[in-house]
Swiss-Prot record:
Record's cofactor remark: Binds 1 [4Fe-4S] cluster per heterodimer. The cluster is bound at the heterodimer interface by residues from both subunits.
Gene Ontology CC: chloroplast
Required cofactor(s): [4Fe-4S] cluster
GO molecular function: 4 iron, 4 sulfur cluster binding; ATP binding; metal ion binding; oxidoreductase activity, acting on iron-sulfur proteins as donors; oxidoreductase activity, acting on the CH-CH group of donors, iron-sulfur protein as acceptor
A biological process from GO: photosynthesis, dark reaction
Keywords, alphabetical: 4Fe-4S, ATP-binding, Chlorophyll biosynthesis, Chloroplast, Iron, Iron-sulfur, Metal-binding, Nucleotide-binding, Oxidoreductase, Photosynthesis, Plastid
Source species of the chain: Pinus thunbergii
Compartments where found: Plastid, Chloroplast
Listed Pfam families: Oxidored_nitro (PF00148)
UniProt similarity note: Belongs to the BchN/ChlN family.
Name of the molecule in the record: Light-independent protochlorophyllide reductase subunit N
EC number(s) recorded for this UniProt protein: 1.3.7.7
Length: 467
């Protein structure tokens, strides 16, 4: 991976605390993506309350995840953890019959040093169901890194690209008890090495990105994760991999070091500009010249004209929450917005090198100043800077949204960008809808004169409701 960072982009680091969801929230979208999986979160009542409230799914709906609640006997080592987990997994196999069970470790399992990795192989052999262990706990920087941890663990179970002659396939059969689906070649593809895309996206977005690459005669050999555990892609020497999300640096490192794959360092397909750059970075690797991307991007920008007129000249401040701030900021700058600061809990500068380069090029193209990038920002310092800058919009975690709104700054929850469909050419309108909603609300309240806190000319004033 390239380690060169553009010199004109300055990266600062403060000593702030992490203000983010717990990474076990990754269960909320991964259990829907991997359709034959079952997630077992090993934690305390607090973890259960969080999942119950964050996911909004009642237990009566029988979702494909559950809590293995630790009791006082587990903490004091009076109970046999192996037997307790075995009982739960046998019940899960009987009731839900999953192809894979994924144990999610929490802060408590880290503190009491529960040997989940040691118990999983033995229990896997006993019950005949693959068991993966992912420690997606609150020690991470951001909640999106829960997915990164799960995918990194899952990459170890992907079959090898080529099995040596005469080697037994017993291991592969054990890990993948279901036959792999045969692919149908409906399009004549270019002759190129295998390409695997990693990152969890809804099925419709997977189809969209597959279609975009198919138009360039590039065949996607598989996705990590796949919809079914048995359909995990083959990995190994000579396989090229490319990510779709900025928070998957741990997975990228695993694919490079452990599976010997070649990483394509590309910007991320968020927004029309990012999607075009993502495809343009993949094509030359396989000796293919990208076609018709510029015209495609221009058509998308033309269709967004009504939104662009609304956001052009507006300012935005990223407090930092989910590790996709760089990509969203780059897209908003391309839309004509002014980005004062990009706060981000953590950034792998090698994995996001191409995204940083695209950010700089976008600022130059739009004649915008390069925003300040602050890693691990201190919220107190950020609030002081916001008081001076008075941005039109702050993209922040939920904890700071209401206090900032009371001070006349429009806010948008950063978590909404995580769960919204923001990838590909076709979903740029959804991103702008999220951004413009608080801007339109503030303008409407201003026109109605029915709010007690409205900002005009960067000053707060109190208005009396119309009787």
């Amino acid at each position: 991976m390239s380690t060169k960072i553009v010199e004109t982009i300055t990266l600062e680091c403060e000593t702030g605390n992490y203000h983010s969801f717990c990474p076990i929230s990754c269960v909320s979208w991964l259990y829907q993506k991997i359709e034959d999986s079952f997630f077992l979160v090993v934690g305390t009542k607090t973890c259960g309350y969080f999942l119950q409230n964050a996911l909004g799914v009642m237990i009566f709906a029988e979702p494909r995840y559950a809590m293995a609640e630790l009791e006082e006997g587990d903490i004091s080592a009076h109970l046999n953890d192996y037997e307790e987990l075995k009982t739960l997994c046998i019940r899960i196999r009987k009731d839900r019959d999953p192809s894979v069970i994924i144990w999610i470790g929490t802060c408590t399992t880290e503190i009491i040093k529960m040997d989940l990795e040691g118990m999983a192989p033995k229990l896997e052999y006993e019950i005949g169901v693959p068991i993966l262990v992912a420690r997606a706990n609150g020690l991470d920087y951001a909640f999106t890194q829960g997915e990164d941890t799960v995918l990194a663990v899952m990459a170890h179970r992907c079959p090898d690209q080529e099995l040596p002659i005469g080697e037994s396939k017993e291991t592969k059969t054990k890990l993948f008890p279901f036959p792999l689906l045969k692919e149908k070649n409906l399009v004549e593809y270019a002759n190129h090495p295998p390409l695997v895309i990693f990152g969890s996206l809804p099925s419709n977005l997977v189809s969209q990105l597959d279609t975009e690459l198919r138009r360039q005669f590039i065949k996607v050999s598989g996705w990590l994760p796949a919809q079914r555990y048995a359909d995990l892609p083959s990995l190994g020497d000579g396989v090229y991999v490319c990510g779709v999300n900025p928070f998957l640096s741990r997975t990228a490192t695993t694919l490079i070091r452990r599976k010997k794959c070649e990483l394509i360092v590309a910007p991320f397909p968020i927004g029309p500009d990012g999607t075009r750059a993502w495809i343009e970075r993949i094509c030359p690797v396989f000796g293919i010249e990208a076609q018709s991307l510029e015209e495609r991007e221009e058509r998308i920008w033309e269709s967004l004209k009504d939104y662009l007129d609304l956001v052009r000249g507006k300012s935005v401040f990223f407090m930092g929450d989910n590790l996709i701030e760089i990509s969203i900021a780059r897209f908003l700058i391309r839309c004509g917005m002014i980005v004062y600061e990009i706060g981000i809990p953590y950034m792998d500068k090698r994995y996001q090198a191409a995204e940083l380069a695209l950010l700089q090029n976008t600022c130059i193209r739009m004649c915008m100043p390069i925003p300040r990038i602050v890693e691990k920002p201190d919220n107190s310092n950020q609030i002081r800077r916001m008081r001076e800058l008075q941005p039109d919009l702050a993209i922040t975690g939920m904890a700071h949204a209401n206090p900032l709104g009371a001070r006349g700054i429009g806010t948008k929850w950063s978590v909404e960008f995580t769960f919204a469909q923001i990838h590909g050419f076709a979903n740029a309108r959804d991103v702008l809808e999220l951004v413009t909603r608080p801007l339109r609300r503030n303008e409407n309240l201003d026109n109605l004169d029915r709010t007690t806190l409205v900002r005009k000319n960067n000053e707060l004033y109190t208005s009396t409701p119309v009787k």
